[in-house]
Amino acid sequence: MEPESIGDVGNHAQDDSASIVSGPRRRSTSKTSSAKNIRNSSNISPASMIFRNLLILEDDLRRQAHEQKILKWQFTLFLASMAGVGAFTFYELYFTSDYVKGLHRVILQFTLSFISITVVLFHISGQYRRTIVIPRRFFTSTNKGIRQFNVKLVKVQSTWDEKYTDSVRFVSRTIAYCNIYCLKKFLWLKDDNAIVKFWKSVTIQSQPRIGAVDVKLVLNPRAFSAEIREGWEIYRDEFWAREGARRRKQAHELRPKSE
């Protein structure tokens, strides 16, 4: 009996914790639930339990990798913009043919000093290491930590077809959200309008891919046989296929309620 999604595992754990905290108020109910949990646990094979835990670990590491990637790009763009403005200011002050003077020169000098102090403080405070260095070493440090479990976190290299499909999905989804906003904001159309319904269906059909599309866990060939490694890949692919179908179905079912 496998959960439909990773969130269900946490829900089951919360239910178990709640039953423990509540205490033995009704003895018969506790015995019944305990017997039921024993039967459910006996029905789950050891391989399925291991694969389920790997799914939870993989999903958490995927979330962390995504957060670290966003953090790295945000502060990389920040430093790049600061460097660009600083270089332009330095050029205007010392390399232009016309001598800059007056208030313009004071503003340029203040800007250059402000950028220099900001960059120095950014390094001294450790923000450069936290936002640039550590995210770049995320995979190395993570794999050192999970090496004892004989698993490794690797990047998934998407094919050109997958990249093209992802780009089309992103553009379609962005256009659909913009059109829905404009139709409802400026034309005062309701949710039950046919045009609004069409663009909402576009947002549902153009949802991004889920699962092992960016990072994934691979098992160590020295510790796991080829059969177990193949079973893990199949288990994960089937899980995310069911999860994607469930999310699309849920989105379709929620549409009439919002309308």
Swiss-Prot record:
Keyword terms: Endoplasmic reticulum, Lipid metabolism, Membrane, Nucleus, Sporulation, Transmembrane, Transmembrane helix
Residues exposed to the Cytoplasmic side: 1-72, 128-259
Intracellular or extracellular location(s): Endoplasmic reticulum membrane; Nucleus membrane
Keyword Lipid metabolism: yes
UniProt xrefs under InterPro entries: Spo7 (IPR005605)
Keyword Hydrolase included in the entry's annotation: no
GO BP, sorted A to Z: lipid metabolic process; negative regulation of phospholipid biosynthetic process; nuclear envelope organization; regulation of phospholipid biosynthetic process; reticulophagy; sporulation resulting in formation of a cellular spore
Annotated segments matching region Disordered: 1-40
Name of the protein: Sporulation-specific protein SPO7
Annotated gene: SPO7
